[in-house]
Every structure is written in structure tokens, then in C-alpha cells.
Amino acid sequence: MAKSFQHPIVVLANGRFPSHSNPLEVLDSAGTVICTDGSADTLLKFDRTPHVIIGDLDSTKLKKSDFKGLWILNQDQHKTDLQKTLQWCLLNGLNDVVILGAMGKREDHSLGNLHILSEFSNKMNIHFVTDHACIYCFIGEKTFPSTKGQQISITAIEHVQSINTIGLKYVLDKESFPPACNGISNEAEGEEFTIDTSLPVWLFINHP
């Protein structure tokens, strides 16, 4: 079924609608835009139309009869609309997804969405793009592009026994890394940096 959707795949969650050029460029270049419930209304206010709407559909003012795209009703009260949307993406072979609107507005929703990122990061290629940063969750070794002086923050989800970095100003060398603030506001030294972590971390690559 994935062949019927145009790539890139962008999911718009119902947090703060993007205003920075980076997430807006992601939205403008999307082949398929999937909205989580009420985010469809926000998208329409900005003269853009979603291709898919997913959720319990109790937040959107749209009616199914007025929507020409794919309308997916999922009333599972034990999952958020973002969880339902990502699960639907997996079931349909959409394994490469960028998420906008995941942060901002309610802080509890933002924190919950970060944990959803960690939940799905080992199942699909996924990251958030916000007005401030690209946010990833990963385990093991991974290299990311950067610019010199770019602000990089690393946050442990649980106590990491060993983490190494290459290409960051403040080096971590097989260090124990607790879920605290000691990984905030590091800096990239050049065009790329590498992190190798024994347990999942959140990585914030702030926009230059």
C-alpha cells in the first residue's frame, strides 16, 4: 500500500504549527501530509490540505463528507493520535517519516511526544523538526551533519552506562551519562559529529 503514497511522508501533530523556515520547507516539500485529528484544521487555515487524517476525530471540525482524502477513524482511548498515526504508517509500509507540530502548546503533550519518538525510533526512520531543532532518538553509533558552532544537546532517557562523542566541543569518552542537564548546549566543531551510546538518548540539533 505504501506505493500509493508520495514521498516524503510528513506527519503534522497538533502542537504548535511551524513558523521557522526549516520545518516550513519540510512541509512544502512533502509528497504526503498526514494530520493527527485537529491539526488538519490548523493546516487548512494556512491554505494547505492534508492527504490523510487519523485519530479519534473528536478535535477536528471537518466532516468526513467534506474531506476528499483518506479518513482513518481510530477510537482507541489508550493511545494518542500521534501513536495511532505512526502505527498506521508502519502497517502501511511508511517507514521514513518526519514529524512537525510535535512540540509547543501543552508541556505534557510535548513530553509525551518525546517518549513516542523513543517508542517508535527503533521501528522506523523518524525525527521531529520544530521551530528550534531537529530532534532524534537513537541507540548505538550514528553520525549527523552539522555546521561549526551549531548548538547540540544530548539528553539521556535513562542512565546510560557508556557514551562517546566525536566532533563535539565538549567530548564524552566512554562516560556514564545520567538523565540530567549535563549534555545541554554542546557545540559542533565541524561538518559532522558522531555519537555512540549504549542506551537510547534524545538528540537536539538546533537550527543554525
Residue spans for each PLM region:
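Short Gly/Thr/Asp-enriched flexible loops that form oxyanion-binding sites at enzyme active sites
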Residues: 108-118
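Short, well-ordered alpha-helix to beta-strand connector turns
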Residues: 30-31, 50, 67-68, 94, ...
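Short phosphate-binding loop-to-helix
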Residues: 69-92
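Class I SAM-dependent methyltransferase SAM-binding "motif I" and its flanking Rossmann-like core
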Residues: 118, 123-147, 152
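N-terminal beta-strand-loop-alpha-helix module at the start
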Residues: 1-64
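Long, charged alpha-helical interface segments
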Residues: 139-208
